[in-house]
């Protein structure tokens, strides 16, 4: 079966890429069981708890990340260096259970997927 990776690289709410990526992720989950979800750069901000997008008149789609385990999507990886570069604690209570990886391990894990979709 084909392994598909979704890579989130943009901050939430500034554009629609995070929401569109999440929609695509849920749609593809009906077609394949081997899905990996990767967060790097500003994409790590997608998983911050207690966001208030309504303050900037945006839809709150972040809570939808919490349903990924219901779709049997549990391979989620966060770049530890990206977290630290943004001044965030690695002990943050992310909205999704993620495995923090050093950049080399993160890239190695990503390389094991057949298709990579970036948002």
From Swiss-Prot:
Any Pfam family hit: DsrE
Subcellular location per the Swiss-Prot or TrEMBL entry: Cytoplasm
Keyword tags: Cytoplasm, tRNA processing
Gene Ontology CC entries for this record: cytoplasm
GO BP annotations listed: tRNA processing
InterPro entries on file: DsrEFH-like, Sulphur_relay_DsrE/F-like, Sulphur_relay_TusC, Sulphur_relay_TusC/DsrF
Taxonomy, superkingdom: Bacteria
PANTHER family: PROTEIN TUSC (PTHR38780:SF1)
NCBIfam families in alphabetical order: PRK00211.1 (NF001238), sulf_tusC_dsrF (TIGR03010)
Annotated family: Belongs to the DsrF/TusC family.
HAMAP family: Thiourid_synth_C
Subunit: Heterohexamer, formed by a dimer of trimers. The hexameric TusBCD complex contains 2 copies each of TusB, TusC and TusD. The TusBCD complex interacts with TusE.
Main function: Part of a sulfur-relay system required for 2-thiolation of 5-methylaminomethyl-2-thiouridine (mnm(5)s(2)U) at tRNA wobble positions.
Protein name: Protein TusC
Annotated source species: Pectobacterium carotovorum subsp. carotovorum (strain PC1)
């Amino acid at each position: 079966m084909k392994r598909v990776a979704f890579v989130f690289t943009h901050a939430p709410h500034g554009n629609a890429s995070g929401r569109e990526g999440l929609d695509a992720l849920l749609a593809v989950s009906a077609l394949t069981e081997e899905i990996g979800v990767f967060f790097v750069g500003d994409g790590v901000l997608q998983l911050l708890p207690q966001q208030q997008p309504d303050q900037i008149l945006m839809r709150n789609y972040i809570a939808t990340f919490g349903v990924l385990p219901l779709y049997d999507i549990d391979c989620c990886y966060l770049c530890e260096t990206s977290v630290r570069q943004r001044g965030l604690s690695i002990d943050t209570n992310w909205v999704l259970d993620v495995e923090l990886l050093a950049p080399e391990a993160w890239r190695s894990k990503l390389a094991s997927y057949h298709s990579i979709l970036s948002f």
